């Protein structure tokens, strides 16, 4: 179980590296050789997408202001980047614990999981759904995850000016907040990802 009153962090490189095992799960669904793994890293440049920010992201501020009261106990920042959002929550009284590069134990469960700007850098829809499934598997029975993706189609057509890969993502999940620049989706632990029609009408 996730420790009460703590915010855990997991950096994007740990989430996305095909050779990393998150618990007992291999995100890619297959093993890649070191050469293939390096090619994937070079092709997508996902390790360069974590921005250096002096302020927390807009989704982090919105989540704290609107649903933060649900997030205090057993929270994981899944793909925390440089940790700016985690520090933002820590200043506001959350006990931040866990190294940025620590993989999850297969039995770790969290009341809430935050995943911001991670899914846009995964080229494969199949692998994006594997990441979402992995997040779902680490929720407590009453847990929720909030998945933030960029929604500016003009700048999500593959390559950015900084040489990183970003793709437009439309998830089969309920939307809790949508604005210019990003969308926040909600994933509940009971959702059957193979049958979105069962939960899209219930939320």
Task: Give the location of each predicted region.
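Acyl-donor binding region in acyl/amide transferases
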Residues: 121, 127-130
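A short glycine-rich, Lys/Arg-flanked "PGG" loop and its adjoining helix->strand segment in the class I
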Residues: 129-141
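Intrinsic, low-complexity polybasic segments
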Residues: 4-6
């Amino acid at each position: 179980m996730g420790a009460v009153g703590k915010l855990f962090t997991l950096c994007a490189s740990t989430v996305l590296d095909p050779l990393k095992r998150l618990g007992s799960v291999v995100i890619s669904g297959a093993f890649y050789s070191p050469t293939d793994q390096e090619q994937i890293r070079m092709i997508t440049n996902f390790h360069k997408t974590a921005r250096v920010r002096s302020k927390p992201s807009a989704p982090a501020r919105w989540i704290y202001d609107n649903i933060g009261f649900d997030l205090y106990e057993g929270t994981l920042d899944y793909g925390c980047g440089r940790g700016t959002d985690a520090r933002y929550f820590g200043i506001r009284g959350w006990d931040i614990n866990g190294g940025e590069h620590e993989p999850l134990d297969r039995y770790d469960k969290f009341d809430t999981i935050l995943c911001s700007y991670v899914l846009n850098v995964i080229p494969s829809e199949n692998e994006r759904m594997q990441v979402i499934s992995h997040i779902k598997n680490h929720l407590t029975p009453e847990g929720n995850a909030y998945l933030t993706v960029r929604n500016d189609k003009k700048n999500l057509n593959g390559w950015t000016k900084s040489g990183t890969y970003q793709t437009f993502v439309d998830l089969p999940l309920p939307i809790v907040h949508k604005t210019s620049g990003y969308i926040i989706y909600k994933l509940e632990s009971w959702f059957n990802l193979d049958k979105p029609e069962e939960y899209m009408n219930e939320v």
